[in-house]
Amino acid sequence: LHVQARTGSYAVAGAVVACTSIGEAVAMPMTARLLGRIGMMPTLVSAALINGVSMLALAFIHVPATFLMVLGFLIGASVPPLLPAVRALYPQMVPGQGLRALFALDTTAQELIWVIGPVAATFLASAISTAIPLLFSAAVTIVGTVWFLLSARQFRPTIVSSTVAFGKVLANRAVILAMAASLALVASFTALEVGVLALYGNHNLSAGIALAATGVGSLLGGVLFGHRHLGVRGLSLSMATVAAGTVLFGLVDGYGVQLAALFASGLGFAPSLAAIYVMVSNQIAAHSTAEAFGWLNSGALVGGAIGTAIGGVVVDAYSPFAVIMVSAALAMTAAITPLIARTAGPVG
């Protein structure tokens, strides 16, 4: 919104957003690995400061489009690796079966962020200024990072320095499965977003409520099922629920029934991610967990970009219904990945 308002170009705005995603996807595994190498304090504080300053620069500095893209890349590359840090520390905080409940809470909180964040940013941009969400984001990044570090002191957490080569964790079958499944699942979600927005056209409120229905379904699914041991079949069934609800949404008429279908599709989203995170946490050595979760974050970002790109192309070439079916196909692809992986042996 901010870049489009400044430049008058949606193409430039999209390019800046793409550069931000690329920057985060490329850098996150590396910054996550630094957590064990140089420590949480210097890694997180330096990243938060660079990220905050970069967002302030994007908010106030008038520069050509090329420099805006560079700023976007820097913003993405400097995102503090808080998610990998927190998820690597969970086993130290809650042992045993409590870990599932904690990851379920994690994915539920993530759903709240995905629902509230875009709405809040859009409201602030339209009500006050497009620069305000960037200022708010910079403040949240810096204050939130400091708050996390101060809160973590009472647990005396430690992230072990990795003793293996960078990227070697990608050879682990649990990480491969987790990246493939989460990439396809997130791609399904972002493609569905494109389909919903295209289906309801200029009815922004209807589209917003429809997307919120998916988020609420995922939120409830995380609370009710995220703490349970799913197993391979359960994980596949959870992701198949996302696919089935998406297909139903594309086939039914009537706004109320469509909302119900989207709600049903969301029920499997958070439990699936929670199960994936628990699997990685259990199967990866302590010195590699932060890097592994950094790669998972990158995979999710790539999946989101793929889903959005495919959705846009399919909408232009065919119809909103076609995008919704593509979204369902991506979710079904995610659902079969655990079954395929199991044929090669247990993966956790």
Language-model segments: which ranges?
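C-terminal transmembrane helical hairpin of 12-TM major facilitator-type secondary transporters
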Residues: 234-276
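Helix-to-loop junctions at the C-terminal end of transmembrane segments
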Residues: 26-40, 125, 220-234, 315
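Hydrophobic core of transmembrane alpha-helices in multi-pass small-molecule transporters
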Residues: 65-81, 183, 258-271
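C-terminal ends and interior cores of transmembrane alpha-helices
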Residues: 49-63, 241-253
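Cytoplasmic helix-loop-helix junction between adjacent transmembrane helices
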Residues: 72-112
